[in-house]
Amino acid sequence: MKKSQKRISNVSEIKAQLKTVETKVHNGVFLFSGIMTIAELAQKINVSVNQIITYFFHQAKMYNLNHSLSEDEIAEICLEFGLDFKKEVQIDASNFMEEVSILDQDKDLSPRPPIITVMGHVDHGKTTLLDYIRKTNIAKNEKGGITQHTGAYQVVFQGHIINFIDTPGHEAFTQMRARGAKVTDIIVLVVAADDGVMPQTKEAINHAAAANVPIIVFVNKMDKPNKDVDRIKNELSALNIVTEEWGGSNIFVYGSALTGQGIDTLFSSILLLAEILELKANKNRYPIGTVIEAKLHHNKGTIATLMVQNGTLMVRDFIVAGYQYGRIRSLENTNGQPIKFAPPGTPVIVTGLNYVPEAGDKFFGFHEEKFAKQLALERKQSEKISKTKVQTKQQTKEKTLNIIIKADVAGIAQALHSTIEKLASKQVHIHILHSGVGIVNKADILLAQTSNSIIYAFNLQIPAAIKAQAKQAQVEIREHTIIYKIVDEIKKQVRGMREIRYELQQIGTAKIIAKFWFSKVGSIAGCSVLSGKFVENCKIELWRNSKLIHSGKIESLQRDKNPVKEVQVGNEFGTHIYKFNDIEIGDELKAFLDVEIEE
């Protein structure tokens, strides 16, 4: 990028889209931004609180004026009173990174390098593949084939740049997704030709599916004499990863990370898929991207690896990441060489931040310190409010029970998978993100944390370290040794999650034939049952001269001064209406009972 080239400011883009939604009726349309109380809604749409409460009473919902209505309930009331409605998203410091749309014109866009994450089962050759690609000896010095560090680097193939995020197993990938980061464009899934699909292979596929990231399969160890390619294809097709040779959509590359066989084909396949994905960005704007890793150095302070996904990052730029801001002091490429700027699709090592951002934090770059500082301050102040909004929003969505199954043998895992899926109801969907064999591990905890899942462990010993990690991540692990107990537990959960629907059915009518006053209680109505029956604590409507006067419930039911459970037609009883004393002889009472509607 030329030094004289002026970058488009992110400040103007964000300021233009920050908006406060004014809750009001405009041209017959009720505009609102989220939940509100009955009292607030009544005032805004100019109807009485009683009208709204009565509406929900007939829906078998006993609300008061301070009850907070969900967005769906607000929509119901609007329809009931003849109003159109529109929910508008309020954009402020707390959510601008998620809600602001950075719209670049087509003429300003140019292709950017793809960002790749390599995943696979331990010892299937992931580290060896990365090592061969970057031509270092890291793999030789690492224990157990498990990567001991994180970061990102670039390779050049036939004049094209390809970015690789080097992560320890699946954890970093999942942590980033947990924080809402969409940084990976393509996953390269490494599967050993002599070993086939293993538990971590399935985990990687589930992670990719949950993040909606396409997969290229690299069948490794093709130099081994006991390779079985057909087995690999069959096992992967059972997991919806189907080779193009069989009419599927997944590219399969065959090779050896040890000898380098197939690496060029892998690069070509990555570039082909990247072209299909049309990965483009605008280099002539201030930067937007994701934090890959960050750590505190005893001499240099915070050192962070950032992936620039749009725009160009330069020294002295101010960035907001997470809930703080800082200024870039230096830029280095992943080889440790100083650079002047980092265009889209570039991993870059930066210094100058006075805090340590978290992996997966999105960042925005600015030229104005005042604006960056203000945004960071407001984001920090609204963090708790923002979390509350997210929780409330999730409560209004379709209810889903997310489950991860781990068992000691494959047959049990499959049986549990099949049985549990059948326990879903019309209101509650059961989503089994992963089922596998073996102990619960860190990847399971992270997947559960990301997807708000419960882990069911059958006939397994859970290591203390895993239990501690689960507790810290607020992930539930439920241990069982009897299948039917898991089934019973999930049935109860589904029932508890579903919105129980009731139908308010009229069960009787009565006439007030006498009234009395007791100072400790209030008005007592002497009634005669004209039809049906009255039962203890039933809901009632009080009618006078064909007008509805009150909706509520009876607080007591007595015959001959003795409490009774119910009173049948033709009999008399005394009752007090809860928090209501304005009764008259001749008033009619209608009794109602909530009846649960079966799905």
Curated annotation (Swiss-Prot):
Q: Where does GTP bind?
A: 120-127, 166-170, 220-223
- Please list where the region (G3) is annotated: 166-169
Pfam families xref list: EF-G_D2 (PF22042), GTP_EFTU (PF00009), IF-2 (PF11987), IF2_N (PF04760)
Which residue intervals make up region (G5)?
Answer: 256-258
Q: Where in the cell is it found?
A: Cytoplasm
Residue ranges of the region described as G2: 145-149
Annotated segments matching region G1: 120-127
The answer to whether the entry has keyword Transmembrane is: no
Q: Which InterPro entries match?
A: EF-G-like_DII, IF2_II, IF2_N, P-loop_NTPase, Small_GTP-bd, T_Tr_GTP-bd_dom, TF_IF2_bacterial-like, TIF_IF2
Provide the residue span(s) of the region labelled G4: 220-223
Which CDD domains does this chain map to?
IF2_eIF5B, IF2_mtIF2_II, mtIF2_IVc
**Keyword field:** Cytoplasm, GTP-binding, Initiation factor, Nucleotide-binding, Protein biosynthesis
- What's a single GO CC term here? cytosol
GO MF entries: GTP binding; GTPase activity; translation initiation factor activity
Q: Which domain of life is it from?
A: Bacteria
Which residue numbers delimit the tr-type G domain?
111-278
Q: Which family does it belong to?
A: Belongs to the TRAFAC class translation factor GTPase superfamily. Classic translation factor GTPase family. IF-2 subfamily.
Which PANTHER family does this chain map to?
A: TR-TYPE G DOMAIN-CONTAINING PROTEIN, TRANSLATION INITIATION FACTOR IF-2-RELATED
Function field: One of the essential components for the initiation of protein synthesis. Protects formylmethionyl-tRNA from spontaneous hydrolysis and promotes its binding to the 30S ribosomal subunits. Also involved in the hydrolysis of GTP during the formation of the 70S ribosomal complex.
**Name by which UniProt lists this protein:** Translation initiation factor IF-2
